[in-house]
A protein has these predicted regions:
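Short, well-ordered alpha-helical segments
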Residues: 55, 153, 208, 296-300
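Catalytic cores of large soluble enzymes that bind and process phosphate-bearing ligands
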Residues: 1, 5-15, 48-49, 53, ...
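Active-site phosphate/pyrophosphate-binding segments
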Residues: 5, 9-40, 131-243, 310-327
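Phosphate-moiety recognition in structured ligand-binding domains
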Residues: 4-9, 129, 266-327
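Glycine-rich phosphate-binding loops that contact phosphosugars or nucleotide phosphates
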Residues: 36-182, 235, 242-282
Length: 327
C-alpha cells in the first residue's frame, strides 16, 4: 500500500499506525473503576464500530484470564436484555446511529452506567452518556471505516488494563510494515476474480470485519466462517474459483484446509499468518496484545490491492453509506 494515494481510504489506513503510536492507554482510566465495581461490561454499536473493537477486547480478556465478564451485541438486541447489572460502552463514529440512540435513551431513563466513543463531538450520543471520548484520529472521508475502527478498538482494549501497552510503539512500527507489504499479484488475482470470498478465522472480529470490508472496498460478495466452520459441511455448496482467506489459521487444521477446500473443492486459498503455510501467504509479525490489529491491516492491504486492480472507487461505493442507519 503506497502513500500519496488519490483515495482517502488508503491515506486514512496509512494514518492508523500513528493513531496507535499516540494513543493514551489511560484515557478511560476513570471508566474502569465503574466497570470493575459492576464486574460486567456490554460493548455495543453497529457494523465496524462494534465487530472488531468489541470482539478483539473480549478475545484479549479471555486470553488473559480476566475476571471481568464482557459481552457484545448489536444495539437492538442489547435493548432486549436486562442490563441493570452492566456498564454499557458504545462506539459510533457519527454519534447518531439509530439503533444505538434508541438503546441509550432507554439506558439513560433507567440510570444504567453508560459511556460513549465517537468521532463527532456534540452528537446525540454525547448527550446520552455519563461520559464520552471523541476520537483523536478525526472524521473519515471514505465510506469504509479504517483508522476509526483501530482507535475504537484501542479504547475498548484499554478498559482491560493489560500490560501489553509497553509494546505500543513496537506494535505501531509493525503495523507500518504490514501496510507497506506489496501484495503478490497471485493473491490479488484470486480475490479480484472470485465471485465469492470467504474469510475464515477466530471470533475476535478480524475475519468478520474483513468480510464487511470486502463488500465496501473490493465490491465482493463475502461470507464469514467462524473458527473451523469451513470444515463442517459448507464445502457442499462451495465452488471452484471462489476464494478463501485464512486469518492466522489453526496450525492443527492447515492440512485439512488444503485437502478438503483447495484440492477437494478447488477454492483459491490464501492466508494471512505469522507462519508459513502451504498457500500463498502474507506473512506478518506477531506481537501479543496487538495481533488482531496486524492481521486486520494485512487484510486491508489485500482488499485495497484487489479494489484498485478492479478499478473501483475505493472511497465511494454506489449504495453503501457512511452512516448506515441514522437518527
Amino acid at each position: 500500500m503506497l502513500s500519496g494515494s488519490p483515495f482517502s481510504l488508503v491515506n486514512e489506513m496509512l494514518e492508523a499506525p500513528g493513531v496507535l503510536r499516540r494513543f493514551d492507554s489511560n484515557a478511560v482510566a476513570g471508566w474502569t473503576k465503574t466497570i470493575a465495581a459492576k464486574g460486567r461490561l456490554m460493548i455495543t454499536g453497529e457494523g465496524s464500530s462494534r465487530i472488531f473493537p468489541a470482539k478483539n477486547a473480549i478475545d484479549l480478556a479471555m486470553r488473559s484470564g480476566s475476571a471481568l465478564h464482557i459481552c457484545t451485541e448489536g444495539a437492538r438486541q442489547a435493548a432486549e436484555y436486562d442490563l441493570s447489572k452492566y456498564v454499557v460502552v458504545a462506539a459510533s463514529n457519527s454519534g447518531r446511529t439509530r439503533e444505538l440512540i434508541g438503546l441509550f435513551e432507554k439506558l439513560a431513563a433507567a440510570k444504567i452506567p453508560r459511556f460513549g466513543i465517537t468521532a463527532t463531538a456534540g452528537s446525540r450520543l454525547t448527550e446520552l452518556v455519563d461520559e464520552c471520548r471523541v476520537l483523536s484520529c478525526g472524521v473519515e472521508r471514505a465510506v469504509a471505516s479504517s483508522k476509526t475502527v483501530l482507535e475504537q478498538a484501542l479504547f475498548c482494549q484499554s478498559l482491560l488494563g493489560g500490560d501489553e501497552w509497553k509494546n505500543q510503539s513496537r506494535a505501531a512500527g509493525y503495523c507500518e510494515e504490514v501496510l507497506g507489504i506489496t501484495v503478490a499479484p497471485e493473491i490479488t488475482g484470486f480475490i479480484q476474480s472470485a465471485p465469492l470470498v470467504y474469510f475464515s478465522g477466530r471470533n475476535n472480529g478480524v475475519a468478520e470485519e474483513l468480510t464487511l470490508k470486502a463488500n465496501e472496498i473490493a465490491r465482493k460478495k463475502s461470507a464469514y466462517l467462524e473458527g473451523t466452520y469451513a470444515l463442517h459441511g459448507i464445502e457442499e455448496v462451495m465452488r471452484k474459483g471462489e476464494a478463501l482467506v485464512l486469518i492466522e489459521p489453526f496450525r492443527e487444521e492447515v492440512e485439512k484446509y488444503k485437502a478438503i477446500l483447495k484440492e477437494g473443492v478447488g477454492l483459491n486459498v490464501v492466508a494471512i499468518a505469522s507462519f508459513d503455510t502451504p498457500f500463498p501467504t502474507i506473512k506478518i509479525p506477531a506481537l501479543d496484545g496487538f495481533n488482531g490489529y496486524l492481521q486486520l491491516m494485512a487484510g486491508w492491504n489485500v482488499l485495497v490491492a484487489a479494489g484498485i486492480a478492479a478499478g473501483v472507487n475505493l472511497d465511494k461505493p454506489e449504495r453503501a453509506r457512511k452512516v448506515g442507519n441514522a437518527v
